[in-house]
């Protein structure tokens, strides 16, 4: 009976340890995903800013061409 009791405690202990390790890895993976999403969001906003700058320059150039044509 004592042998079965020790075996049962050993199995439960090992199960809890493996469960703890799995939870720790799961949390780490979630944190990594959150960091990746934040980095992707920042890159996307930088790309948008760059695109808006280009659009502003093009509109400004077209506007100045339009003014020149009106003067002639």
UniProtKB/Swiss-Prot annotation:
GO terms for biological process: defense response to bacterium; innate immune response. The modification Leucine amide is found at residue 65. Pfam families: FSAP_sig_propep. Amidation is essential for antibacterial activity against Gram-positive bacteria. The keyword Signal applies. Residues 38-47 have a biased composition (Basic and acidic residues). It is found in: Secreted; Target cell membrane. Transmembrane segments: none annotated. Residues 1-22 form the signal peptide. Belongs to the frog skin active peptide (FSAP) family. Aurein subfamily. This is Aurein-2.2. It comes from Ranoidea aurea (Green and golden bell frog).
């Amino acid at each position: 009976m004592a042998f079965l009791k020790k075996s049962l405690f050993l199995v439960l202990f090992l199960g809890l340890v493996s469960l703890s390790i799995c939870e720790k890895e799961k949390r780490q993976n979630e944190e990594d995903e959150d960091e990746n999403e934040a980095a992707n969001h920042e890159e996307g906003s930088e790309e948008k800013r760059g695109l808006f700058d280009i659009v502003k320059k093009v509109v400004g150039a077209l506007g100045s061409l339009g003014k020149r044509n009106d003067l002639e």
